[in-house]
Amino acid sequence: MKIRTRYAPSPTGYLHIGGARTALFNYLLAKAYDGDFIIRIEDTDVERNVEGGIDSQFNFLEWMGIVADESIRNPKTFGPYIQSQKLKHYEALALDLVAQKKAYFCFCSKERLDADRELAEKLHETPKYKRHCLNLNEQTIQANLLANKEYTIRLKIDENNEYSWDDLIRGKISIPGSALTDPVILKSNKIAMYNFAVVIDDYEMQISHVIRGEEHISNTPYQLAIAQALNYDLSKIKYGHLSIIVDETGKKLSKRNLALKQFVSDYEKDGYWPHAITNFVALLGWSPKNNQEIMSLVEMVENFDVNNLSKSPAFFDINKMNWFSTQYFNNISQDEFIDFVKTHPLTKELVLKDTTFIDKALLFKSHIVNLKQLINLVDEQFNSNKQLLEEDVNHIKNNQLTNVVQVFYEQLIVSEKFDEQSIKEVIKQVQKTTNNKGANLYMPIRIATTFSSHGPELAKTIYYLGRENVLKNLQSILKVLG
């Protein structure tokens, strides 16, 4: 049987790191076995859907390199790929289960259900539906329907059954039917509940494997019960439940923690290298056998094995993510870097305004985390209004290196050219004249020309600062040095 996996987000928010991980692992599993990866939109929670939620899922997954074989953007024979287009179908199947006595109409009011829940909590019991409507006679049911009394449809759980599955990540899991409640499968507004719709969709789309977060473990026995009621072959689908992702304090990632950027869009906006995020996310709970860290998408597919997914919490380490991004910026080609800088919203206007911006940016290519940092570094290094720091002046004075600055200034004034090569020649001449080398040569020149004690390649930095700015800085510091 062909491997078919799916990622089925709800458009109630934007693509989260956790969702990106789920999508990536399902994608890798499918591609590792020449299978298909499907994106299905579960949009039945109408009140919570947000504008742009669907586009966020697709756009940022594609930004990470994850493209679906089938979806609303690439529909094939297993559609519709969005649940809101299948509402009548779900309703018909729910009513069919009622006709088969596998499900029943529930006319209980919200007040009655709330009272039952409050009583259970008071008695320290797990709230369960009391089956008030399970055995209503046909006459009562028809009278309620004729009176347009509001109802839901509930599945009748077999309390004597054991709902078990061999989890791909956690091994065998069993939940007794007695621990479950009769779940609502169709709401009063005729919209299918999540657990009902997802079972139907997975079956009809011939999904073979479902990898998802551990919060769905509690949904699985209900989905197995629904599948049994619908006479679906339970052997045709395998479930695997991923570990949680925790922050630096060991707490589960919370979208309410605004101090930690958790949405893929945050990293795209800041100008991270896209595959760095994909690479980082891949290792949130997966350990390749060869312990390789830097991997292309092709290498991820080649190495992926569901048996190497961990059930232990995955640590979201922002420093590790930044490390990945720096590694990629360091390793990509100059042409790739230039194209990225030219086209990214953060930098494309700067490229148009400053013809030397690309050249300046290239000085930092091997060291940056993202383009947001790049902009700050370029501005910091090439800001013509930068202030001279007292500690830098003292460094030159205390090490008796004023003569290095003086000679560099004198040589630069008489130099006919001002380009990278001529600047290097001036520095060589200063070395010969002052007998200084290493830090005693380069540090005072850097401080005097750039008003900074650190930075990229010195000759290039001086060149892109411009002759006028460099001479102005030299004159200023020489006055201070006396």
Curated annotation (Swiss-Prot):
Location in or out of the cell: Cytoplasm
Residues at which ATP binds: 255
SUPFAM superfamilies: An anticodon-binding domain of class I aminoacyl-tRNA synthetases, Nucleotidylyl transferase
Catalytic reactions of this protein: tRNA(Glu) + L-glutamate + ATP = L-glutamyl-tRNA(Glu) + AMP + diphosphate
Originating organism: Ureaplasma urealyticum serovar 10 (strain ATCC 33699 / Western)
One term of GO molecular function: zinc ion binding
Enzyme Commission number(s) from the entry: 6.1.1.17
Gene Ontology biological-process annotations: glutamyl-tRNA aminoacylation
UniProt cross-references to PANTHER family, sorted A to Z: GLUTAMATE--TRNA LIGASE, GLUTAMATE--TRNA LIGASE, MITOCHONDRIAL-RELATED
Similarity section: Belongs to the class-I aminoacyl-tRNA synthetase family. Glutamate--tRNA ligase type 1 subfamily.
Ligase as UniProt keyword: yes
Protein name: Glutamate--tRNA ligase
Alphabetically ordered keywords of this record: Aminoacyl-tRNA synthetase, ATP-binding, Cytoplasm, Ligase, Nucleotide-binding, Protein biosynthesis
Enzyme class at the top of the EC tree: ligase
Motif 'KMSKS' region mapped to chain: 252-256
UniProt motif ('HIGH' region) ranges: 9-19
GO cellular component: cytosol
Quaternary assembly: Monomer.
